[in-house]
Amino acid sequence: VNAVTLGGSLYWVDMVGNRTAPVIFGPRRVVLLAGRNKIVDTQADAERRVQQIAGPKNVARHTGFRTPCAVTGLCADCNSPQRICNSRVWLERCYPAGL
């Protein structure tokens, strides 16, 4: 999870969806842990957190990536083939409820 809103929405940004798909279509029960640093007020704050903090930190772990955020540390909403933020997922609630 890249961010969690105070309203309970979970937000992920991923390169190919390998971190989001298992949560959506995977096992019957999934346990997610998120640190206090990922809690934000609104969905706009969640998107801002990913662009300004999580995205640049994540791409920095991948040596050899030359996206604008890897070079400058700031999201440029690029169109690079190495772009790590291709899929965006908002999880509002689970269905059926209680699982």
Indicate where each model-derived feature is located.
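Conserved phosphate- and dinucleotide-binding cores of soluble alpha/beta proteins
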Residues: 1-99
